[in-house]
């Protein structure tokens, strides 16, 4: 049975982010780069978006953590991502995979399955993405999920056990597992699905949390909790137009306040 995340790991994550300010190398999609960078800054991390194949490998060894998000995958970007992951591993730096639309599109599905052999520290995806990554479903409708997070939990657990990693399957309730333990994270607001980039930005915060000391499962679950809390606060402003600035303010005040 999943254990509900309690407030203590979220409070501890805030402290760790302030104390360590991890540098996160975000090889993320073109749609969300600015928002992702601003979210990382709001939580006390430092973002960098280095995507040229000639530089990505070098920088991956410098950064504290690496995020691979395949949302706008290209052939050149795949080369850069592969090199970055390999150099991050050689340097002992954790990397996180966000398998955007895996299962719905064949090229990215094959690429993400290839990357799984390179031992991600964490994986963050919606239910359809995690099911497809685990080989249990054909996938969802692009970036949208057609399954519930609870339905994908067995796939997440199997994937986590097979890869010795932490898997976060996110939705109305998030489930975070290392294959044995499962933490559930409730909260958030439907407005989080009506603006672009909240899931991708969460993956960046997950990447930051994976670089921090302590229990990685709790750190990743706390990252989910931190984002859901900010979403609840930001939704009080009204609609999607006011949501993004309110969300950034809420994150900043949660961590720095």
From Swiss-Prot:
InterPro entries: Hyethyz_kinase (IPR000417), Ribokinase-like (IPR029056). Keywords: ATP-binding, Kinase, Magnesium, Metal-binding, Nucleotide-binding, Thiamine biosynthesis, Transferase. Its EC number is 2.7.1.50. It comes from the Bacteria. Pfam families: HK. It catalyses: 5-(2-hydroxyethyl)-4-methylthiazole + ATP = 4-methyl-5-(2-phosphooxyethyl)-thiazole + ADP + H(+). Substrate binds at residues 49, 197. Its cofactor is Mg(2+). Pathway: Cofactor biosynthesis; thiamine diphosphate biosynthesis; 4-methyl-5-(2-phosphoethyl)-thiazole from 5-(2-hydroxyethyl)-4-methylthiazole: step 1/1. GO terms for biological process: thiamine biosynthetic process; thiamine diphosphate biosynthetic process. GO terms for molecular function: ATP binding; hydroxyethylthiazole kinase activity; magnesium ion binding. ATP binds at residues 124, 170. It is an enzyme of class 2 (transferase). NCBIfam families: PRK09355.1, thiM. Belongs to the Thz kinase family. Catalyzes the phosphorylation of the hydroxyl group of 4-methyl-5-beta-hydroxyethylthiazole (THZ). This is Hydroxyethylthiazole kinase.
């Amino acid at each position: 049975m999943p254990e509900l995340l309690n407030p203590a790991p979220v409070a501890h994550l805030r402290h760790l982010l302030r104390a360590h300010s991890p540098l996160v190398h975000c090889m993320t999609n073109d749609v969300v780069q600015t928002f992702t960078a601003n979210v990382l800054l709001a939580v006390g991390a430092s973002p960098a978006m280095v995507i040229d194949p000639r530089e990505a490998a070098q920088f991956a060894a410098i950064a504290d953590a690496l995020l691979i998000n395949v949302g706008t995958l290209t052939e050149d970007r795949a080369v850069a991502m592969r090199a970055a992951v390999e150099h991050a591993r050689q340097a002992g730096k954790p990397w996180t995979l966000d398998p955007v639309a895996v299962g719905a599109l064949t090229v990215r599905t094959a690429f993400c399955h290839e990357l799984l052999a390179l031992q991600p520290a964490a994986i963050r995806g919606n239910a359809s993405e995690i099911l497809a990554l685990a080989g249990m479903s054909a996938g969802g409708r692009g970036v949208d999920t057609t399954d519930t997070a609870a339905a994908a939990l067995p796939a997440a657990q199997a994937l986590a056990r097979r890869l010795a990693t932490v898997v976060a399957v996110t939705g109305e309730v998030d489930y975070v597992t290392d294959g044995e333990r499962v933490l559930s994270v409730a909260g958030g607001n439907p407005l989080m699905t009506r603006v672009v980039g909240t899931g991708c930005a969460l993956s960046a915060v997950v990447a930051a949390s994976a670089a921090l000391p302590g229990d990685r499962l709790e750190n990743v679950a706390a990252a989910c909790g931190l984002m859901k809390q900010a979403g609840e606060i930001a939704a009080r402003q009204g609609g999607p137009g006011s949501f993004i600035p309110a969300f950034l303010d809420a994150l900043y005040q949660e961590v720095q306040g």
